[in-house]
């Protein structure tokens, strides 16, 4: 059971002023995730590594390079021979690429699986006007036993800053930035 109370909030500055909330506690949905000791840790849960880190180092309308780095940890008392299978699909669920890699992970260690698609043909480029999203489904196996799955989404795009023009360049085109600042805690502030 969790008790989340801030009964004494007016002695915690600046709560009395009402401009910003300095607090602790649960402010978002919470899930309890139970995994096998050989698993893909959530991002930031293991020395700021975890999950899947996807980049697109080379992008054009004809093809792109996609790099998928996935971290797998072994919390078992013995080493494990781990296979990572990654399936990349388009927004409709059609398989674009299948990747496989194996390595031994010693007990209590984390390993990085570095997988790449050097020539991803005819990518749908992500932009604010066309936010096309691909999926990466990662599966962790020891032997033939599926131990963990992890789903990531990503857009294929190039992003650069033009220092001469002081503008963002997205997929080779100048893109204007728009945004807001909003405090999620209080609808009447921000």
Language model features with spans:
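Secreted/periplasmic carbohydrate-active enzymes, especially glycoside hydrolases
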Residues: 1-190
């Amino acid at each position: 059971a969790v008790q989340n109370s801030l009964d004494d909030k007016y002695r915690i500055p600046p709560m009395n002023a009402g401009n910003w909330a300095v607090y602790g506690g649960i402010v978002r949905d919470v899930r309890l995730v139970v995994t096998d000791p050989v698993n893909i840790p959530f991002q930031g849960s293991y020395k700021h590594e975890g999950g899947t880190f996807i980049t697109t180092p080379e992008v054009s309308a004809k093809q792109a390079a996609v790099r998928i780095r996935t971290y797998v940890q072994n919390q078992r008392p013995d080493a494990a021979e781990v296979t990572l299978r990654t399936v990349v699909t388009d927004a409709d669920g059609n398989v674009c690429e299948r990747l496989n890699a194996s390595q031994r992970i010693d007990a209590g260690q984390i390993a990085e699986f570095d997988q790449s698609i050097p020539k991803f043909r005819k990518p749908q480029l992500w932009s604010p006007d066309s936010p096309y999203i691909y999926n990466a489904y990662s599966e962790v196996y020891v032997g033939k036993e599926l131990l963990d799955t992890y789903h990531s989404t990503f857009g294929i795009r190039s992003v650069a800053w033009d220092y001469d023009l002081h503008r963002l360049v997205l997929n080779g085109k100048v893109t204007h930035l728009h945004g807001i600042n909003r405090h999620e805690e209080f609808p009447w502030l921000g």
